[in-house]
């Protein structure tokens, strides 16, 4: 799991996708939620060309608000993720991460974000 020190360093080194706004970070666990979601996705050689509201999908999975800035930092910190939000090198066939990834992330599931039914956003579930 990412440490607070790693996340703070990531915040300093991130080139944020929303240039016109100040980065918004409510809690370092939001970065951890985004990181775990990105980590579960199949990686591709190039960035996707299809724009998706990834932050909303991540929020529903993690049960908590996650800002675009949090996703930007998570992508910066992940050694296998490249690109700029929402165009990362992840498969368009999304994988629903296992909820076990959020064990120890105290802010997960603390807000009323819920996943949509079925596999609407996902092609497969992580085991």
What residue spans do the PLM features occupy?
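Charged low-complexity interaction tracts in eukaryotic proteins
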Residues: 3-26, 76-122
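Membrane-helix boundary/juxtamembrane interface motif
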Residues: 45, 49-51, 61, 69, ...
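Positively charged, polyanion-binding regions of nucleic-acid-associated proteins
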Residues: 25-50, 55-58, 74
């Amino acid at each position: 799991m990412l440490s607070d020190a790693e996340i703070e360093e990531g915040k300093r080194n991130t080139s944020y996708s929303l240039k016109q706004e100040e980065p918004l970070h409510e809690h370092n666990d939001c970065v951890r939620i985004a990181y775990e979601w990105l980590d579960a996705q199949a990686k591709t050689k190039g960035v996707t060309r299809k724009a998706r509201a990834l932050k909303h999908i991540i929020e529903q999975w993690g049960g908590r608000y996650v800002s675009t800035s949090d996703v930007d930092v998570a992508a910066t910190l992940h050694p296998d993720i490249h690109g700029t939000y929402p165009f990362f090198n992840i498969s368009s066939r999304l994988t629903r991460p296992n909820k076990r990834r959020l064990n120890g992330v105290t802010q997960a599931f603390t807000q009323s974000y819920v996943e949509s039914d079925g596999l609407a956003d996902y092609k497969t579930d992580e085991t």
